[in-house]
Amino acid sequence: MASQSDIVKELQVAYWMEMETVMNYVANSINLDGVRAEEIKKSLAADVTAELGHAQVLAKRIKTIGGVVEGSMKFNAGQKELQPPAKLTDVVAIIKGVIAAEDSAITQYNKLIKLCDGVDYVTQDLCIQALA
């Protein structure tokens, strides 16, 4: 059975994943060049708000269940695939990076859903809603 500290730890992982996605979406929504990039840039810029909203929900839950929302010194980047490409017209690289980031988030939320089962139904429901 998972402890509250186990749940907080995994919520923090999910929180940082969302925050990193925000940073990379902002960077790529600005940096991409070319006619083919315009729709991707618009989509990424629009998704920043949703991803930041996910991070805020996670942060509130961390605090609610007794954790502390970490500051930037605790951040460890991990989204190699979503970094701005060397060739700023490489839209495909960004699309692949978005897919990789979303796959990682889905995996983390599923991990939390299993971890919370029978222990913390509110956090479990929050994670289920994030996947909806």
Regions found by a protein language model. Give the residues of each.
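Conserved alpha-helical segments that form or flank metal/cofactor-binding pockets of metalloenzymes
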Residues: 32-75
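Acidic/histidine-rich alpha-helical segments that form the ligand environment
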Residues: 7-17, 21-28, 60-61, 79-132
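Basic/polar N-terminal segments that are highly enriched at the extreme N-terminus
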Residues: 1-5
